[in-house]
């Protein structure tokens, strides 16, 4: 279990804290979505969890031990831009480089590489120059490197935001399903409202504070929260929410398809 307790952080020469006494727990096998606007503290939280920054106040524990003593190699990070994380010429070289850095014996590497390439379906691309891979293939390549070293926590920082919706949705399902089978922790930093429905738990950050923690089933009860914090709700959902308030009905748990919302409105306005 990951335990974050009273975590605060202020950058040098900044007057105010970027994070203010953030506390939350994440159980093994749980997928936590962290959502908020730019400036909400999401990026700073990523840097603290990933070991790029040191907390000035508060603690981060994993399985009842401080994360610094456990080692940040327990965390696998998937960033927005895979080119930042891929340093070798080919995926095969990248995997060898990754495994060497984690002290894996050379005699064990071929088996691990074969296993992870099978999972991410890139066996036929392992010797292709990385620069010739598509953006989605590069993200899968980074994910292969993470799978190879078996992290306990997967930290995704806007990892799918540069992909088009079709590829993004397919890659999300693949990544989240794969991690779920391992019973590992996923922390998905996002500004995409649709990601919330893929999570087990959600925390909403605003101006460095944790405003609320809730389950995906409660999203429709939190629409005022999102609306009051000027969050861009999907238009069909926003329309349903506003109409529901006007006619004193509960916002329906609908898809984001406009036709579904229009049908619901017509039914209740008859």
Swiss-Prot record:
ATP binds at residues 36-43. Gene3D superfamilies: P-loop containing nucleotide triphosphate hydrolases. SMART domains: AAA. PROSITE patterns: ABC_TRANSPORTER_1, ABC_TRANSPORTER_2. One of its GO terms (cellular component) is ATP-binding cassette (ABC) transporter complex. Residues 1-232 form the ABC transporter domain. Keywords: ATP-binding, Nucleotide-binding, Transport. It holds the Pfam family ABC_tran. Disruption phenotype: Probably essential, it was not disrupted in a global transposon mutagenesis study. It comes from the Bacteria. GO terms for molecular function: ATP binding; ATP hydrolysis activity; ATPase-coupled transmembrane transporter activity. This is Putative ABC transporter ATP-binding protein MG304. The lineage of its organism: Bacteria, Bacillati, Mycoplasmatota, Mycoplasmoidales, Mycoplasmoidaceae.
